[in-house]
Amino acid sequence: MREVISIHVGQGGIQVGNACWELFCLEHGIQPDGQMPSDKTIGGGDDAFNTFFSETGAGKHVPRAVFLDLEPTVIDEVRTGTYRQLFHPEQLISGKEDAANNFARGHYTIGKEIVDLCLDRIRKLADNCTGLQGFLVFNSVGGGTGSGLGSLLLERLSVDYGKKSKLGFTIYPSPQVSTAVVEPYNSILSTHSLLEHTDVAVMLDNEAIYDICRRNLDIERPTYTNLNRLIAQVISSLTASLRFDGALNVDITEFQTNLVPYPRIHFMLSSYAPIISAEKAYHEQLSVAEITNSAFEPANMMAKCDPRHGKYMACSMMYRGDVVPKDVNASIATIKTKRTIQFVDWCPTGFKVGINYQPPTVVPGGDLAKVMRAVCMISNSTAIAEVFSRLDHKFDLMYAKRAFVHWYVGEGMEEGEFSEAREDLAALEKDYEEVGIETAEGEGEEEGY
């Protein structure tokens, strides 16, 4: 089996996690108490969904996941919520005091005390796997726990499980909507370790997803639940091929191979289509070509970043539902002819396609319409550097005055770490710039397309 362990860190990671597991349970017909009426083999069968769920002798399905937070309130909601019987109590780890939006507290003082317990639980889950494939790590980097404890955990996972791939789903601060003054500090300190210790990081940002909810789903005032359910659809599409059987299945390591041209250039944009409310879907014909086009629409990107300002290095298209390879190839051929969608000249093919026959599932009472087919696109584009330069600018404004720095130093950080992380990000922006530059040899061949 190719098992995957999910790790949800901090409030953002846990709430996205709740939405994901809710959706996975619906997709597999697993009830909130972990029973699965359709599963006839008691004990660990070799079913595809066993990559995400382990089975007990009593026929109960338990997610291979750990939830951790430095303060109890968010995890207590899981402990008392609808799915309280789904998780083993040991999988829900919470501390007593929170990180107070401070990376240093999450990474050094308070995180240090809890991280060994977390690794111990992760070790137990890993021992329960026959062939662990890797980790999915969910966190947001604006706060203290997701950024500090999240990066501490990634560093320790690299030591303990060096060769296993780590995919991060990371919620980055939005350009306009802010939840903390020190977001730029936390996210840059955290990205510094995401650079080294994740293999692929999918960037999400709340503002972009708010706008999608408003525009496509007519939700006037989207809540975090609306946002998280949308994120859950993306994550579900990415992992569908691990959990179901299909024509072109995609492994976690395959993402890496196809999307990451250089180790540092691994921050991905994602989009999902069709995002449409039930009232509208009734009147629309959502063909493969249409959903493929909307996946490339800048407005449908899940991070505030315009892919028209950069070039694509690689795209991975994960289709699910009623889709055949012939339609996909035709749609992609059309995309390639469009002048607005540019690829770097050193990567002529640029597409990785996965097809899974399991149609998308929607949460009852949710916002999304039930559709026959959907696509999720994960793309590596040089435009993502916009996100970093925006954060770097905000970081510089504050750091020039050393504002708020004493809170970090007081928790045992050194001021040098700020400049080190900032330099690392400056280098990253430079890397993205260089990747997008035309290669010298390519200049004479422009006409030959």
From Swiss-Prot:
Localisation: Cytoplasm, Cytoskeleton
Taxonomic superkingdom: Eukaryota
Modification N6-acetyllysine occurs at: 40
E.C. numbers: 3.6.5.-
Reaction catalyzed: GTP + H2O = GDP + phosphate + H(+)
Family matches, as PROSITE patterns: TUBULIN (PS00227)
GO function term, MF aspect, one: hydrolase activity
A GO cellular-component term linked to this record: microtubule
Active-site positions on this chain: 254
PTM info: Undergoes a tyrosination/detyrosination cycle, the cyclic removal and re-addition of a C-terminal tyrosine residue by the enzymes tubulin tyrosine carboxypeptidase (TTCP) and tubulin tyrosine ligase (TTL), respectively. Some glutamate residues at the C-terminus are either polyglutamylated or polyglycylated. These 2 modifications occur exclusively on glutamate residues and result in either polyglutamate or polyglycine chains on the gamma-carboxyl group. Both modifications can coexist on the same protein on adjacent residues, and lowering polyglycylation levels increases polyglutamylation, and reciprocally. The precise function of such modifications is still unclear but they regulate the assembly and dynamics of axonemal microtubules.
Required co-factors: Mg(2+)
Site, as annotated: Involved in polymerization: 449
Subunit field text: Dimer of alpha and beta chains. A typical microtubule is a hollow water-filled tube with an outer diameter of 25 nm and an inner diameter of 15 nM. Alpha-beta heterodimers associate head-to-tail to form protofilaments running lengthwise along the microtubule wall with the beta-tubulin subunit facing the microtubule plus end conferring a structural polarity. Microtubules usually have 13 protofilaments but different protofilament numbers can be found in some organisms and specialized cells.
Purpose of the protein: Tubulin is the major constituent of microtubules, a cylinder consisting of laterally associated linear protofilaments composed of alpha- and beta-tubulin heterodimers. Microtubules grow by the addition of GTP-tubulin dimers to the microtubule end, where a stabilizing cap forms. Below the cap, tubulin dimers are in GDP-bound state, owing to GTPase activity of alpha-tubulin.
Name this protein carries in UniProt: Tubulin alpha chain
Source species: Tetrahymena thermophila
